[in-house]
């Protein structure tokens, strides 16, 4: 088992990575401080893992909320479903929420935990690759709004993260590939050696070799933990983790949540960010081609939707959370393993690449 620690002083917490973690309930129980537990999951994950998890939490009073699956369900209505469930069953401040699912479940459960009675404990058990390498770590919680992705939320850290590699065996290939976009992101933005490792291990990753997947997930979580520890509220370096997300969030909002998976939108967003770097003479053509090739190796989209041009992108980008004083801010790769935040991108350059 790999155990990482996200160091945030009193709010520090462990990240456990192993096979069969969902069955290691003694470890899970050690992070639950009182008798009452509510598991939040969805109608895809519940038949796979919910009953077995509940059966092992025999020392606790456990109930559950089962939401519909999909990005479109990460909304204020389902946030209210969770809150109403907790109130109806008279859960108190000592209740622990467990997020059992992918990024949508983790985000909405974390936000409910942040808000219910001004804050209760929650634990992440991410079951998708994307949530394991990115969204379960770092304390970003939110729901979507029709006018923008993740526009209603809070920074609120979990008590622990349990990453069970075995859950990837039930993950559809499209979801796995979408998660690879976030994996590749770490290599592009700040770790050339990891990017090279990914290039060398494409076949092993696609084959689902557990040792390779464990190594890959641990590397991503360590990178995320290091960045979050130095900049929890995204006032500086943490913004680099949004590589591809300025374009990606615009795609998701314009196309309708769930039409494109988040990782698919981020994949295209990273290619567009690299094109922006090319247009600004900040990135070598050879480096751009390697970025595009690695993303394509996992059957991820690399071009924007045909019904989106400059006008559609800019409408959503103006609401981007990274903007400061009305200026659009972009995360741009300047080389494989290097990136920077720029607020000097001209509209002419944007129109050129879009």
Curated annotation (Swiss-Prot):
Keywords: Amino-acid biosynthesis, Aromatic amino acid biosynthesis, Cobalt, Cytoplasm, Lyase, Metal-binding, NAD, Nucleotide-binding, Zinc. One of its GO terms (cellular component) is cytoplasm. NAD(+) binds at residues 69-74, 103-107, 127-128, 140, 149. It is found in: Cytoplasm. Its cofactor is Co(2+); Zn(2+); NAD(+). The keyword DNA damage does not apply. GO terms for molecular function: 3-dehydroquinate synthase activity; metal ion binding; nucleotide binding. It comes from the Bacteria. GO terms for biological process: amino acid biosynthetic process; aromatic amino acid family biosynthetic process; chorismate biosynthetic process. Gene3D superfamilies: 3.40.50.1970, Dehydroquinate synthase-like - alpha domain. Zn(2+) binds at residues 182, 245, 262. Pathway: Metabolic intermediate biosynthesis; chorismate biosynthesis; chorismate from D-erythrose 4-phosphate and phosphoenolpyruvate: step 2/7. Belongs to the sugar phosphate cyclases superfamily. Dehydroquinate synthase family. Catalyzes the conversion of 3-deoxy-D-arabino-heptulosonate 7-phosphate (DAHP) to dehydroquinate (DHQ). HAMAP family: DHQ_synthase. This is 3-dehydroquinate synthase. The lineage of its organism: Bacteria, Pseudomonadati, Pseudomonadota, Gammaproteobacteria, Alteromonadales.
């Amino acid at each position: 088992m790999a155990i990482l620690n996200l160091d945030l002083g009193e709010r520090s917490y462990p990240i456990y990575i192993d096979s069969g973690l969902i069955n290691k309930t003694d470890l899970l129980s050690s992070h639950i401080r009182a008798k009452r537990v509510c598991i939040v999951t969805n109608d895809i994950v519940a038949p796979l893992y919910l009953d077995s998890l509940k059966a092992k939490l025999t020392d606790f009073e456990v109930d559950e909320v089962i939401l519909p699956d999909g990005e479109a369900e990460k909304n204020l209505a389902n946030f209210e479903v969770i809150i109403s469930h907790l109130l109806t069953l008279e859960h108190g401040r000592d209740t622990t929420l467990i997020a059992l699912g992918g990024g949508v479940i983790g985000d909405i459960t974390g936000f409910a935990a942040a808000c219910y009675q001004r804050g209760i404990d929650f634990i992440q058990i991410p079951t998708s690759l994307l949530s394991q390498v990115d969204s379960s770590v770092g304390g970003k919680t939110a729901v979507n709004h029709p006018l923008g992705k993740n526009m209603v939320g809070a920074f609120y850290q979990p008590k622990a993260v349990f990453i069970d590699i075995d859950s990837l065996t039930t993950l559809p290939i499209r979801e796995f590939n979408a998660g690879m976009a976030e994996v590749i992101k770490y290599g592009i933005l700040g770790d050339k050696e990891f990017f090279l490792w990914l290039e060398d291990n494409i076949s092993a990753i696609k084959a689902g070799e557990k040792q390779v997947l464990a190594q890959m997930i641990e590397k991503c979580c360590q990178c995320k933990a290091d960045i979050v520890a130095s900049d929890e509220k995204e006032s500086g370096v943490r913004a680099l983790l949004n590589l591809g997300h300025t374009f990606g969030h615009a795609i998701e909002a314009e196309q309708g949540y769930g039409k494109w998976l988040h990782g698919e939108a981020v994949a295209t967003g990273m290619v567009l960010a690299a094109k922006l770097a090319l247009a600004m003479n900040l990135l070598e053509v050879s480096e751009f081609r390697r970025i595009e090739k690695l993303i394509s190796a996992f059957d991820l989209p690399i071009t924007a939707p045909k019904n989106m041009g400059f006008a559609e992108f800019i409408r959503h980008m103006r609401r981007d959370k990274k903007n400061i004083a009305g200026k659009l801010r972009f995360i741009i790769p300047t080389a494989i393993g290097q990136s920077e935040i720029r607020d000097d991108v001209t509209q002419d350059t944007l129109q050129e690449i879009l």
